[in-house]
Regions:
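Catalytic/regulatory signature loops of cyclic-dinucleotide turnover enzymes
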Residues: 3-29
């Protein structure tokens, strides 16, 4: 029961926090609030963005993915997720990572040791820069400030840049994204 209650609170907060959530069997009902369409709208926005991402990636031959400096699990996991999207589209993709932090190291080593992933899954910023051409796209995950990215120089080299981030934007933004 505690888990159901905790989930209901999270759902109410995700929909604006101004309503009650009641689970009756398998059915979930929402009472009160002015944000009842938020969940549907959010799903529609996510679907539209996913479709746009797919269309953009289909026009490129190579995909470079990078997160922020001093990478954490959030950044690393996001990069792996985008890599899997690229793999599903049969696109060549690599994750840019210069310094592996102690929190990321165990996960990265599992990918390094896996025969399911290519040897060039992880590249340094310098290695990635050498691969950039007109058919390269750069996906920046978990960061929206150029100075915080793993390899800011790539932002100058790549013409097609996509930013996927959940943080608030500051005055410092990635140009041409």
């Amino acid at each position: 029961n505690y888990e159901f209650a905790r989930t209901a609170i999270d759902m109410a907060l995700g929909r604006g926090g101004d309503q009650a959530v009641v689970k009756n069997g398998e059915k979930i009902q929402y009472y009160g609030g002015k944000s009842q369409q938020l969940e549907k709208t959010t799903r529609v926005k996510a679907r539209v963005k996913a479709h746009a991402l797919r269309e953009l990636l289909e026009t490129k031959d190579r995909l470079l993915i990078m997160g922020h400096k001093i990478g954490d699990i959030d950044s690393f996991g996001s990069a792996i997720g985008v890599y899997r999207i690229a793999a599903a589209l049969n696109k060549k993709a690599s994750i840019v990572i210069n310094d592996v932090t102690s929190s990321v190291r165990p996960m990265k080593e599992r990918f390094d040791d896996s025969s399911d992933y290519p040897d060039d899954l992880f590249l340094t910023g310098k290695e990635a820069a050498e691969l950039v051409d007109a058919n390269t796209a750069l996906v920046v995950v978990d960061v929206n400030r150029p100075s915080y990215t793993e390899e800011p120089e790539l932002l100058k080299l790549v013409k097609t840049i996509i930013v996927i981030d959940h943080h608030r934007q500051s005055s410092e933004i990635i140009q041409n994204a």
